[in-house]
Amino acid sequence: MTNYKKSKYSRDDRKHIAESIENLKNDEDYVAIFEILMDDESNSYTENSNGVFLNLSTVSDTTLDRISKYLNKINTQKNKHIEVDTDIIPTLINNKNERTYKLSNYEKNIIKQRNLRKAVDDDVDYEEFRFSNKKNIKSVKPNKLIETINTNRTNNTDNKSTKSKKQTETKKSLRTNKIVKQPINKSKKNIREEY
């Protein structure tokens, strides 16, 4: 009767080692692992016309230790030899140009308009101007000023021609957007507005 000891390598560990051996790319590594298996007391491989097959379920723990150390050594050497080409590292600009979705024409136009506004606002300083006649501007305290548009209130004694003349003047002043500032008169009867 054979004396079976409990192995420190589980079935999953042995599968992982077998998969990592299958993924090797150098024939030299296969030969080195085969030599490690030849040193083991149990013949854990079979050979036929298709090739050599390994049976890791019968291999001792010491042999599995040696194989796993060799595989770790190979993996660390691979990690040391990986070269990074800094020209190929993607940047934020490259990722922005390579979107996974496409914008509609409407969305593209919105983005263009927003960028144009930003560019114009950065380059140009604006000042606000008000156009008015010099005779209309009076120096009065601001709390006594009101802004009015020429309404041309007239007395009942004015004739129709005067009213029509004043109405055309009002239309003209509305077209030119003139702003007139006048002092506030306390008596309602004497209100006159100039333009």
From Swiss-Prot:
Superkingdom, according to UniProt?
Answer: Viruses
Low complexity bias (residue ranges): 148-159
Give positions of region: Disordered: 143-195
**Listed name of the protein:** Uncharacterized protein R378
Lineage in the entry? Answer: Viruses, Varidnaviria, Bamfordvirae, Nucleocytoviricota, Megaviricetes
